Amino acid sequence: MGRKKIQITRIMDERNRQVTFTKRKFGLMKKAYELSVLCDCEIALIIFNSSNKLFQYASTDMDKVLLKYTEYNEPHESRTNSDIVETLRKKGLNGCESPDDQRYFEEETFSKLIEDSDFVFKRDPALNKKENRGCDSPDPDGSYVLTPHTEEKYKKINEEFDNMMRSHKISPGLPQQTFPMSVTVPVSNPNTLPYSSPGNTMVTASLAASASLTDARMLSPPPTTLHRNVVSPGLPQRPPSTGNAGVMLCSSDLSVPNGAGTSPVGNGFVNPRASPSHLGPTGGNVLGKVMPTKSPPPPGGNLVMNSRKPDLRVVIPPSSKGMMPPLNTQRVTSSQGTQPLATPIVSVATPSLAPQGLIYSAMPTAYNTDYPLTSADLSMLQGFNSPGILPLGQVSAWQQHHVGQAALSSFVATGQLSQGSNLSINTNQNINIKSEPISPPRDRITPSGFQSHQHHQHQPRPEMDSLSSSSSSYDGSDREDVRNDFHSPIGLGRPANNEDRDSPSVKRMRMDAWVT
């Protein structure tokens, strides 16, 4: 909005003249004040209106300025209206208002302030007594009018600010968010898994070392009545916590002297001197045992197995006869039909592994005909015997007995997995029930393992091959026979012959339970 330039002539309207006088008089005093402060000078204004009413302004004291004025006799600059008009004509303004003159309001807006012109000076005595010297201008508040339009704008701004604060205000009553963490540790609950003893837990080594899981209700899998849990071989594997390869432990009640637990060590066996916090809740009679596989894991695995995927299987057996299922057999297949499921097994008779600090199993492996368990070895197991484990006095006779008569009530198969990968546990819901004969076939099973003596004679191997060999995948006719009157912490493995190794057919695992 530009300035309205007016002709500098006498205002004929008395009302407008009074308004203009009030406005410009104050402007003149304001300019005098600014000049006195900025330029450090003394100013005195003496104004008589048309009614001969006096208005004066002095930067300090009017009497002092007037005294100095009367005593001053030197030549000085003195101007009148004619001098100012002449100067304005030279600048080409032709008597119009100078653009430097500030106009606060239009003259007609001050018509209502005619009667209040004298009230301004009475309200603010600083204009007369020169007390307001620290501010820019002694402008009284009465010269500013709050119009209804301006007041409406202020109210609108306040409402918008309040709405913004309410929209961004965080409610203090909101509960703190919690994020559930999924754990791949299925815990067998007796109410949901009837084929497992209370407290049987499958724990990966790195997870068991980081947390102790004690509440079985919080870790129970969904209530799908499964009887066994099967490890899916095609899933990625958990990184190892021991610096070697990832080892999955099926932890159970292991009677170790001095209350020490077990934990995986670098050689793939179970260390009895480790901290007991490395194992979860225990229950049952299972002894962890690590065995190499014939099919090595992917690159990045352990030093022996370095080319193929491992084949894993996990079975959680009952802890007593009362927990056995009805007289039928369950058949669990892998979640990937094309992936073979075989238990990687390390022979405890391998001469390349140091026997110190190891827990030997009572199970004769595929090559234990050259390295049988002696009485000294059996005496080492006296501290580990429990009511659920095979009595050690019967081990020798049991080794001579047919393997088909030995049942697996507690079985742990722990695979030597590759480094830097995850180990996942799946519960397979494909359960096929099939009747089985009372006794297993005897043509393929011998007391020396799951391979006949003829295979040992026609396929001789060095003793060091026990680290790189493993039990192959089970085909449709192979199976493991389980009896409910025998409890032993053993892991069985069967090296496959050349026909099974070269067979292109789809391999699968069968775990059958039969009762005599």
Swiss-Prot record:
Residues 318-339, 420-516 are annotated as: Disordered. Residues 465-475 have a biased composition (Low complexity). Restricted to the somitic mesoderm of early embryos. Expressed in the head region of neurula stage embryos and in body muscle (myotomes) of the tadpole. Expressed in all tissues examined in the adult. The keyword Transcription applies. GO terms for molecular function: DNA-binding transcription factor activity, RNA polymerase II-specific; histone deacetylase binding; protein dimerization activity; protein kinase binding; RNA polymerase II cis-regulatory region sequence-specific DNA binding; sequence-specific DNA binding. Residues 1-100 are annotated as: Interaction with hdac9. Keywords: Activator, Developmental protein, DNA-binding, Nucleus, Phosphoprotein, Transcription, Transcription regulation. It is found in: Nucleus. GO terms for cellular component: nucleus. One of its GO terms (biological process) is positive regulation of transcription by RNA polymerase II. Pfam families: HJURP_C (PF12347), SRF-TF (PF00319). Residues 476-486, 497-516 have a biased composition (Basic and acidic residues). The keyword Nucleus applies. The modification Phosphothreonine is found at T343. Residues 327-339, 420-433 have a biased composition (Polar residues). Interacts with hdac9 and nlk2. This is Myocyte-specific enhancer factor 2A homolog.
